[in-house]
UniProtKB/Swiss-Prot annotation:
Belongs to the formin homology family. BNI1 subfamily. This is BNI1-related protein 1. Residues 767-781, 818-828 have a biased composition (Pro residues). May organize microtubules by mediating spindle positioning and movement in the budding process. Potential target of the RHO family members. The modification Phosphoserine is found at S621, S751. Gene3D superfamilies: 6.10.30.50, Formin, FH2 domain, Leucine-rich Repeat Variant. The gene is BNR1. GO terms for cellular component: cell division site; cellular bud neck; cytosol; mating projection tip; mitotic actomyosin contractile ring. It holds the Pfam family FH2. It comes from Saccharomyces cerevisiae (strain ATCC 204508 / S288c).
Length: 1375
């Protein structure tokens, strides 16, 4: 092995002082002498050392063995004290046999640090023993060159220290002067300073006096040229080992600015930039966060330029810099590593809030692109482990900053998508905030904001939920598709980008169309399956019923038949009993009439006879109870001095409206009785009403016999099932009975309200068969009458007789068929001579219920829960609401009887019914008439107020058609005739996408050409007679080439193209309308609040109306605003409803929000939408037919130049799919609409009702909102008025406590206070005070009289206050 020092080279991995190999100067320093006790310096040096340490074997810089100058070697100290004192011969050719001695000497040489340091210490350990001896010999021989041998090592060291101090002092003497001047002196001074600064003794002397460091920073810095940058930076890197120098450099703003500007200087050497970054990195650890702040303040100014320059460095080719840098790859690795270390150090030096701002600034400058490039470039490089670690650290720091800030903002745990992935399903993440924070101040911030705004518009738009869901699914699918399928390379070429863009465009359009169609078909299929399930459930229910009917055995049917036969026989017997009862009733009536005519006595005698008759009946154990009751009533009636007119039964609501049924039949009978004595008739009427028999008159018996008894039985059964009084409207027999004013007692409403129940007593009587009645008593003598009058006490104990027993027909089955009793004796005349019976004493008991056995199988069955739902009756006359009632409430919302009951209870408990009675009561007719007269008078008073070449060419078209050609084809005027024709035949996008041109091609004049026009163009089309088409004008030429030559299929072609160009727009318009209707239907089906509102409105209306309805139609909602209050004409029934709902039922008030989507349906006609859907379907079917079997089905029938089939064959299938989807959607929507209409009591078969189904909802919502606004404004005005009034009262009370003079001034102020407040409230310039100033003058006079002792002062003041209050109230109402 050649050991010549001139030929051998060394592998030296570290950067040398010189920028080029030929100019390198030896470098040395003593690491063991550095002050490593400073923790900050140690951390910084350790961080830099780790980052720049080489990993494994890599490239090395091969340098010559002659690496140090003579000056460096001559000034080096002794390597070893032991070696210096020995007489060993350091001959390179004669190596000692003791290898351990060579190793020890070489280790001492390395530990000295004068000649080798840093990575050289590690690398030189691996060289051979022979090589180590050569280095020792070279250094030892140089050390003894030209010097005398020192006898003692101590003496030598003393001389060496003395020389070193002298040399340092001599160098410092001229250092300030040399550093302040430029040129060669500055260059020599810097190089020499860099060498001296490696010595600890010189470093202490240099820093002992601040003038040296100040001169180096302030005076030398402006003089630094490009050649001196590296040595200048090396000086500061050595100075950074001292804490005082670090602090001084950190607080020198010009120095820090020079370091940062050097990073962006593209003319400077990269090694200088790398060294500058290392110095900035070291300074970020000084004084905690202060160092980071000072460094970032200067670095942020030039960070954008620096990052761009760094990107250029990473993108440049290696061959470009091979001539300047020996190892370009290693330099890029070192540069990138230091860059990442500096960024991470800055982020770690701030708190999270400031770090977030810095991170957003870095994002804005596209630092993520740079990091992504580094990650891709050095992902598999074994020498770039530090880079990958720093990238990972940057990402983790970024995530930590985002997580901490989001946690602080939202008070939640880790919300960043990259953290806590396992908790995504269990905890909702605030992805929107995280996304915005992550994209803030970056290039992607604007696109992400646009995407979020688009998503917000989708959610906030009026689109139905189904449409919004499809759009969101589409967006999500597209994003996943694009992310997975279109990954763009790191640096794609322009051609690759263009090609990928074209592929994306094609695939994107096709994917979007397919995805939309699949989403729509899925929605329709889902709804169709739901509809099928409902129908299957109904079919299974019907099958169960059918099976139940079929499974009935014959024995069961025979048993039912036997029961029916027994019921028929029983009813036959009952009919016979009724006939016998009619005969008995007729006979009894004759007796009563005869008795009435024979015994015509005065009232006093009749009273005595009644008392005696009552006592006789009382003594008889088998007497009738009716006479006892009559005696009691007679004793009570004697206390009344004047007779009172009783209320007739005909006055009742039921009988009054029903008695007119037989009015015409009874006129003849009534006319025969007009000649009789009126007094007798009145007495007879009172007598019969007192007896309380429901007996028809003799004159009506014949009419009653002609009426079937089944009608009576069915009606009585109906009343019995309802538990109420029988309805006499449906029975002409009962109506005829009730129409007789002489036989029916007068029924008082008070007696009914008092709840006098006679039915139980009457029902119990027939249980024991009564004995035969006693014979009619003779008329009493006059003496007995006088004696009876003299003993009122004895008469008072006689009770009035009870009603007669019921006929056998009305007894229960337990009584059996008992023969009717004999008729009762005729009553004495005195019984009919009562003196004005009271209204409270005359009671007609209701008809007793029929026995269960008499119920007819054909009788009407009514749900008792429905008929019992009545609001409490009211005595006041209220305004009526004209309902459009629903007769059949089955399967409608009105079928919910439970909610109806709850609604009535709540309205009654909250006092809503009482408020209705006060607000909507009927006014008296006189007031209404006066008001109408006043209004009519007011109304009457108010009623009294071409070029020359074109002209030479031939044209057969009409002027109008030629002008239309020019107008519609003006955008293609630059094209020639044939160019335009070929554009049409090629189906160019400019033609196909222009709807106006396609519509023009479909005009009648162009598709249906008359024969006369064909004859004119025939020579040109066939080329006969030598006529050339060039002789025709432009419009005629186009007309000839297209409309005439292609007339066989031109009509079909034009209509097909027009359909294909417009079908998508029409499809989405119709789908949008249908989905709006679906959305409205779903809201109406899912709104329990609106259902509750309907029940409240109905029950309040039932309380006001005379007739109760089970349900109302939707049209009735619009009539609520026409029912005005009797107190204030500005208040309608709808105002009242709105206030009640808002105050009493705030949870129901949200129905307005539930139905807000219905407001948009006012412009949509259901019939029109349905017809458009069918028309669209038919149009697409015709299109498909044309291309399958029509004129456009075969290419040989078309012009060879025509490309229509190739252009539209894919669009036809798509149009057919959309047509089927649309018609399916339309059918499902109509099915749901029919169900909803039936639910609200509407007829789905009525076209008018279907078209206007949503209109009542829209109008009602508009009126309801208007009423709500007016109510709130009125309440606010009243609140302001009450505040002003309370303020006035407080001031008045305070003024009364003051003295007299102050009292006068206070009253004047109070009088003006309200007027001033009113004027401010109305905000008018003209003050309405002069009108009341006159009143104020009078008030002042009254106030003066108060001091004079007037007694009426208080009343006058109250009167004045009342007047002023009314005036203020009028002003507020005018507002």
């Amino acid at each position: 092995m050649d050991s010549s020092p001139n030929k051998k080279t060394y592998r030296y991995p570290r950067r040398s002082l010189s920028l080029h190999a030929r100019d390198r100067v030896s470098e040395a320093r003593k690491l063991e002498e550095l002050n490593l006790n400073d923790g900050l310096v140690a951390a910084g040096l350790q961080l830099v050392g780790v980052a720049l340490e080489k990993q494994g074997t890599g490239s090395h810089i091969y340098m010559k063995q002659k690496n140090f100058s003579a000056n460096d070697v001559s000034s080096s100290p002794m390597v070893s004290e032991e070696v210096n004192g020995s007489e060993m011969d350091f001959n390179p050719k004669c190596m000692p046999q003791d290898a351990s001695l060579v190793e020890r000497m070489f280790d001492e040489l390395l530990k000295d640090g004068t000649f080798f340091w840093g990575a050289a210490y590690k690398n030189l350990q691996n060289i051979s023993l022979r090589r180590k001896w050569l280095l020792i010999c070279k250094i030892r021989s140089s050390n003894h060159w030209g010097k005398k041998k020192v006898t003692s090592s101590t003496t030598y060291s003393t001389h060496l220290a003395t020389n070193e101090l002298a040399e340092n002092a001599h160098f410092l003497d001229g250092l300030v002067r040399n550093l302040s001047t430029g040129g060669m002196k500055l260059s020599k001074a810097l190089y020499k300073l860099e060498k001296f600064l490696r010595k600890q003794s010189f470093l202490q002397l240099f820093l002992k006096d601040e003038i040296y460091l100040t001169t180096l920073i302030e005076k030398t810095l402006p003089l630094i040229s490009k050649e001196l940058q590296f040595v200048y930076l090396r000086c500061f890197k050595i100075l950074m080992n001292n804490p005082l120098a670090r602090i001084r450099a950190l607080h020198s703003e010009p120095l820090i600015r020079w370091f940062t500007e050097l990073l962006t200087d593209q003319n400077s050497n990269l090694k200088c930039q790398l060294l500058s970054m290392e110095l900035l990195l070291l300074l970020t650890y000084v004084e905690g966060s202060t160092g980071c702040e000072l460094i970032w303040d200067q670095l942020s100014i030039l960070f954008t330029d620096w990052l761009e320059w760094f990107d250029k460095i990473l993108a440049d080719d290696i061959a470009i810099h091979s001539s300047l840098y020996l190892n370009w790859n290693q330099l890029k690795i070192d540069y990138s590593t230091t860059f990442l270390l500096l960024i991470n150090s800055i982020l770690q030096g701030f708190n999270n809030k400031t770090a977030l701002e810095i991170l957003n600034f870095l994002k804005k400058n596209n630092i993520h692109n740079t990091i992504t490039f580094l990650e891709l470039a050095y992902k598999d490089d074994p020498n770039s482990v530090v880079i990958m670690e720093q990238i990972k650290q940057f990402k983790s720091k970024e995530s930590a900053i985002f997580d901490s800030m989001i946690k602080t903002t939202n008070d939640t745990n880790s919300l960043h998508p990259t953290k806590d992935i396992a908790r995504i399903e269990s905890e909702p993440l605030c992805l929107e905030n995280c996304l915005l924070l992550k994209a803030k101040d970056s290039p992607v911030e604007a696109p992400i904001n646009e995407i979020i705004q688009s998503l917000w518009k989708i959610l906030d738009s009026q689109k139905p939920y189904s449409e919004s869901i499809k759009l969101l699914k589409l967006i999500n699918s597209l994003l996943f598709y694009l992310i997975d399928s279109f990954q763009v390379s790191t640096n794609p070429s322009f051609d690759e980008t263009l090609e990928s863009a074209e592929n994306v465009d094609y695939v994107f359009q096709d994917s979007v169309n397919k995805l939309l169609d699949s989403l729509q078909s899925d929605e329709i299929a889902r709804r169709a399956v739901t509809e099928i399930d409902d129908l299957n459930a109904k079919i299974s229910h019907l099958n169960e019923k059918l099976n139940l009917v079929e499974n009935h055995d014959k024995d069961h049917l025979i048993a039912k038949l036997d029961e029916s036969e027994s019921l028929i026989s029983l009813k036959t017997k009952e009919i016979e009993n009724l006939k016998l009862q009619l005969k008995a009733t007729k006979k009894r009536l004759d007796q009563i009439t005869t008795h009435q005519r024979l015994y015509d006595q005065p009232p006093s005698l009749a009273s005595s006879n009644l008392s005696i008759a009552g006592s006789i009946i009382k003594n008889n154990s088998h007497g009738n109870i009716i006479f006892q009751n009559l005696a009691k009533k007679q004793q009570q009636q004697q206390k009344i001095s004047l007779p009172k007119r009783s209320t007739s039964l005909l006055k009742s609501k039921r009988v009054t409206s029903l008695s007119s049924y037989l009015t015409d039949a009874n006129n003849e009978n009534e006319s025969q009785n007009e000649s009789e004595d009126k007094s007798k008739d009145s007495l007879f009427q009172r007598s019969t009403s007192t007896i309380n028999f429901n007996i028809p008159s003799m004159k009506n018996i014949t009419n009653m016999q002609n009426v079937s008894l089944n009608s009576i039985l069915s009606e009585l059964e109906f009343s019995n099932s309802l538990g109420t009084q029988p309805n006499y409207q449906s029975s002409p027999v009962l109506s005829s009975v009730s129409s007789s004013p002489k036989l029916f007692p007068r029924l008082s409403s008070d007696s009914l309200d008092n709840g006098i129940q006679l039915v139980p007593e009457v029902v119990k009587l027939p249980q024991l068969p009564p004995p035969p009645p006693p014979p009619p008593p003779p008329p009493l003598p006059q003496s007995l009458l006088t004696e009876a009058e003299a003993k009122p006490d004895g008469v008072s104990c006689i009770a009035a007789p009870a009603p007669p027993p019921l006929p056998d027909l009305f007894k229960t089955k337990t009584c059996g068929a008992v023969p009717p009793p004999p008729p009762p004796p005729p009553l004495p005349e005195s019984l009919s001579m009562n003196k004005g019976p009271s209204n409270h004493d005359l009671v007609t008991p209701p008809a007793p219920p029929l026995p269960n056995g008499l119920l007819s199988s054909s009788s009407v069955s009514i749900n008792p829960t429905t008929t019992d739902l009545k609001p409490p009756p009211t005595e006041k006359r209220l305004k009526q609401i004209h309902w459009d009632k629903v007769e059949d409430i089955k399967d409608t919302l009105w079928e919910d009887t439970f909610q109806r009951q709850e609604t009535i209870k709540e309205l009654q408990t909250d006092g809503i019914f009482s408020q209705i009675e006060d607000i909507f009561k009927m006014k008296s007719p006189t007031k209404i008439a006066n008001k109408r007269n006043a209004e009519s008078s007011i109304a009457l008073s108010s009623n009294n107020g071409k070029s020359s070449n074109e002209l030479k060419k031939i044209s057969f078209l009409s002027r109008d058609l030629a002008q239309q050609f020019g107008i519609n084809l003006h955008m293609f005027s630059q094209l020639s005739d044939m160019e335009f024709v070929m554009k049409v035949l090629n189906c160019d996008n400019d033609i196909v996408q222009n709807v106006n041109i396609l519509k023009f091609f479909c005009k009648e004049e162009l598709v249906n050409i008359p024969k006369s026009m064909l004859n004119k163009y025939e020579p040109y089309s066939q080329g006969k007679d030598g006529k050339a088409v060039s002789d025709l004008q432009r419009a005629d030429r186009i007309f000839l080439e297209l409309c005439i030559n292609l007339r066989f299929y031109w009509n079909a072609r034009s209509k097909s193209l027009l359909t294909l160009s417009t079908y998508e727009r029409d499809y989405y318009d119709l789908i949008f309308k249908l989905q709006k209707i679906d959305d409205a239907i779903s809201h109406l089906n899912r709104s329990p609040k609106f259902k509750s509102l309907m029940f409240i409105i109905t029950e309040i209306g039932n309380h006001m109306n005379k007739r109760i309805v089970k349900g109302i139609k939707l049209k009735s909602l619009t009539k609520l605003a026409f029912v005005r209050s009797s107190i204030d004409q500005n208040v309608s029934f709808l105002h009242f409803i709105e206030k009640v709902i808002r105050i009493k039922y705030p949870d129901i008030y949200g129905f307005v929000d539930d139905l807000k989507n219905i407001e948009d349906l006012g412009k949509i006609s259901l019939e029109h939408v349905e017809s458009e859907c069918h028309e669209f379907h038919k149009k697409i079917e015709d299109l498909v037919t044309q291309f399958q079997v029509g004129k456009l089905s075969k290419e040989e029938n078309l012009d060879p130049r025509d490309q229509i089939i190739k252009k539209v064959k894919f669009k036809i299938n798509r149009a057919k799919t959309k047509s089927e989807l649309l018609i399916g959607q339309c059918k499902l929507t109509l099915i749901d609409l029919n169900k909803l209409m039936k639910y609200y009591g509407e007829d789905p078969k009525d076209k008018e009702s279907k078209n206007e189904f949503f209109q009542p909802f829209i109008e009602f919502l508009a009126m309801f909102k208007k009423c709500a606004k007016e109510n709130i404004e009125k309440e606010e005005m009243e609140r302001v008025y009450e505040q002003r009034k309370s303020l006035l009262d407080m001031r008045t009370s305070s003024n009364k406590k003051s003295n007299g003079s102050d009292e006068n001034d206070g009253e004047k102020v109070n009088r003006d206070a309200v007027d001033l407040l009113i004027s401010k409230l109305r905000e008018v310039k003209k003050d309405p005070e002069p009108l009341r100033r006159r009143k104020s003058t009078k008030l002042n006079e009254i106030a003066i009289n108060v001091h004079e002792g007037d007694v009426k002062t208080r009343k006058d003041e109250d009167h004045v206050l009342l007047e002023r209050t009314h005036a203020m109230l009028n002003d507020i109402q005018n507002i």
